[in-house]
């Protein structure tokens, strides 16, 4: 069975179990890291922020061998990379929407969310968001359309849309690159 041999092919190894729970968890954050890094290849510089919705990451990743099938189970959708540009005031609203959802997969961001799902504090790359500054966000097309309770993600000033680069392909490439360098997967890029 060709499909079985393809899906069972080992492409890497994880040193740790990675879950997908709110408000924060390893696997969605790692996927957000991969999106953020991919923006560097596409746009010439790593995005300030990476965002993936918890619903886009469908299952956990167990410690041990990672197969092609595991990656398809984790990322079953054909979501494509989008690199979006926002003013800080809109990025602040996005962070407030994420807080109301009690967290999503994030990269480049530190945030404190209250038990009432209110944003108490946020930093991008270790600094407060400046309303007039311009920020880049690497995410997926589904979220760039303002879906999944984050309408402000659809209010970008500029965008680079890469339908040829799905989040699954990017994550697979990341896992294979790590394996080629004899680096097992940990919870952050």
Regions found by a protein language model. Give the residues of each.
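Feature captures C-terminal
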Residues: 25, 29-189
């Amino acid at each position: 069975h060709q499909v079985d041999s393809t899906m069972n092919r080992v492409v890497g190894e994880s040193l740790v179990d990675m879950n997908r729970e709110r408000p924060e968890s390893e696997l969605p954050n790692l996927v957000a890291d991969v999106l953020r890094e991919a923006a560097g290849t596409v746009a010439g510089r790593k995005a300030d922020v990476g965002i993936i919705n918890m619903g886009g990451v469908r299952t956990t990743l167990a410690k041990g061998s990672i197969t092609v099938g595991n990656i398809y189970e984790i990322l079953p959708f054909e979501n494509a990379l989008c690199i979006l540009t926002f003013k800080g005031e809109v990025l602040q609203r996005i962070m407030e929407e994420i807080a109301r959802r009690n967290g999503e997969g994030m990269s480049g961001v530190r945030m404190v969310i209250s038990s009432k799902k209110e944003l108490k504090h946020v930093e991008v790359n270790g600094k407060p968001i400046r309303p007039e500054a311009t920020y880049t966000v690497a995410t997926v097309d589904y979220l760039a359309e303002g879906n999944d309770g984050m309408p402000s993600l659809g209010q970008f000033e500029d965008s680079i849309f890469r339908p040829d680069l799905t989040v699954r392909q990017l994550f697979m490439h990341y896992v294979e690159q790590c394996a080629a360098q004899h680096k097992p997967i940990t919870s952050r890029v």
